[in-house]
Structures are given as C-alpha cells and as structure tokens.
C-alpha cells in the first residue's frame, strides 16, 4: 500500500533569558508537510544585543544552531547549512528558515535573547 510520507515538524518557540516581557514569537507551534518551507520568527525585547536559535531533538540534548550579535553572525557551528538559513537583518527580529522540511527536522526549536 502506497502512503505519502508526511513530515510532522513540531516547532515550539520559547523565550528564555531576559526577564522583561516583550518577546514576540510566531508561530509558537508548527506542523508541516515534507518538502514545505518552514519560517520561524522571533522579535526580542528592545535593546537585546544577542539572539540564539537552538534545536532539541527527541531524547537528545539541546544544541546551539546559530547566534547573532545584532545583525552579525557570532556563532554558526551547529547550523545545518544545506537546508537551514537564519538572519537578523535589522539587528532586532530574527528568522530561521528550513527548506525543504524533512522528517529528520522534527524537533523543538528554541529562541533566546539578551
């Protein structure tokens, strides 16, 4: 029996770090089909210099994907560059894009700023 393979990517964006409210995250949860583009966006509190994207796969430790200092990349050693891109063009909001989504991308994606 032929069944189309679906990629269920659950993406949770959690704010961590600074104690002041004001971090906007969209979407908080995301389920997508295999091959689709996933765009995660986070807007930190005003004045935050650093932003960090993390990924935690099931039963594994959390791993840093990329860090920005304002719009410049500070660390990107954990970023799988073949299908993942991240940017912080204006030094405030940041996006993480996955394209095309694959089953191995199923994880919790976290964002922090400070």
From Swiss-Prot:
GO terms for biological process: adaptive immune response; cell surface receptor signaling pathway. PROSITE patterns: IG_LIKE. Its main location: membrane. Residues 21-114 form the Ig-like domain. Glycans are attached at residue 90. GO terms for cellular component: plasma membrane; T cell receptor complex. Most probably, the alpha-beta TR is not assembled due to incorrect folding of the beta chain. Alpha-beta TR is a heterodimer composed of an alpha and beta chain; disulfide-linked. The alpha-beta TR is associated with the transmembrane signaling CD3 coreceptor proteins to form the TR-CD3 (TcR or TCR). The assembly of alpha-beta TR heterodimers with CD3 occurs in the endoplasmic reticulum where a single alpha-beta TR heterodimer associates with one CD3D-CD3E heterodimer, one CD3G-CD3E heterodimer and one CD247 homodimer forming a stable octameric structure. It is found in: Cell membrane. The gene is TRBV17. It comes from the Eukaryota. Probable non-functional open reading frame (ORF) of V region of the variable domain of T cell receptor (TR) beta chain. Non-functional ORF generally cannot participate in the synthesis of a productive T cell receptor (TR) chain due to altered V-(D)-J or switch recombination and/or splicing site (at mRNA level) and/or conserved amino acid change (protein level). Alpha-beta T cell receptors are antigen specific receptors which are essential to the immune response and are present on the cell surface of T lymphocytes. Keywords: Adaptive immunity, Cell membrane, Glycoprotein, Immunity, Immunoglobulin domain, Membrane, Receptor, Signal, T cell receptor. This is Probable non-functional T cell receptor beta variable 17. Pfam families: V-set. Residues 1-19 form the signal peptide.
